[in-house]
Structure formats: structure tokens, C-alpha cells
């Protein structure tokens, strides 16, 4: 992984070695990572739609939303397009999360269908996660079983504008929106507006255990996204 000084939020891994590689932004994918792969004769499995420059690889494109929806800033869309092209040029095989995306990727990027596989989103790992009730220490205004819960970023396609509008129409109700709030790729208007809704609480990043606690104790789970790869 690219070691840029930020903390890693990972569970205990027994059979996977974590290798930090010092790199500055795009040099990681363009220079540092390919050099490491060649040196160790390694096969690359890219799970985050990252740009790559090695043919011994498979890549996951969760979806290609930035190419079909106008919800991102121009530079992010250009960067994502370049990532997709590098996947087309170098990856031996591509995986995505639905048959809908499989056909869309083939249509938009010109990748043959027989080169694109489908691996559905997983949830089974949560069965072995213990709920971490300490998350409520960060939410003193939230009562168990009396709030509505949503999880994700504040990116435009997640449609959290809908949650904010519903919260504004129901000031007696409580809402919790967990997840990252970094809108560098989307602009700050949504974040500024969201912070002005007093009955919405933002715990920020939550662990799997904290997420499970919030899901188990909410009155209802909200998922207003208009695009998730299916």
C-alpha cells in the first residue's frame, strides 16, 4: 500500500503480509508499485479501481459511475477515465459487482464481455464482527432505537441530499450519517449544507464493530443512493 502517513484501518490479518511502499501520489501506481511487482515476480490484484502499469494483473472496477453520471469534478472524472483506460490496456481480467455493470463496462470501454467477471458485494464478514457500543459515546444526542441510520460518503450519487431534506422536514426525528466526509472530488457545497442540519449527527469513519452497533440499534436503515453499480 502507499505509505503516506495516514493510519490504516484494518482488522487483524493472519495470512496477508502488509508492505508499505513510500511514494508521492501518482508515482505509486506509475513507478513504485510496478517496480515492486517486477522485483518480486508478483501478480497484482487491484481492488480499488486504481491505475496500473503491469500486465500480470486483474482489476476490480466496482462501477464506472464517473463516466455515466455528472456528479464529480472535472479532474476526478479525467483521472478515473485514465484509470479505466489503463485497466483496458494492461489488466488480464476485470471484475465488477453486477451483470449490469459488466455490460456497461464492455459497452463504454470496449472490453470484451468474456474478459469481465462478476463478483457480488460481500456481507458475510459482518457475521463474525462484535458490535462496538462505544460508538454511542461519540453521539451523546442519539438514543438507541430512536434514530435513522445511513452509511457512506457525502458524494452526489449517494443522494444524502435526500436524507438532509427529510431531516429538515422532520425536526423531531434523529438521523445518523456515518462514513467519510472528504468531498475533494465532489466540491464542498453538499458538506456545507449538510452541516447546517441540526438533527443529523456525523460520527465520521466507523469501524465494522461500530457500524454493526449502529445498524442493530437504529429505527430504520436508509440507503438513498441513485447509483451503486446496479
Describe the residue ranges of each PLM region.
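Carbohydrate transferase catalytic cores enriched for Leloir-type hexosyltransferases
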Residues: 1-230
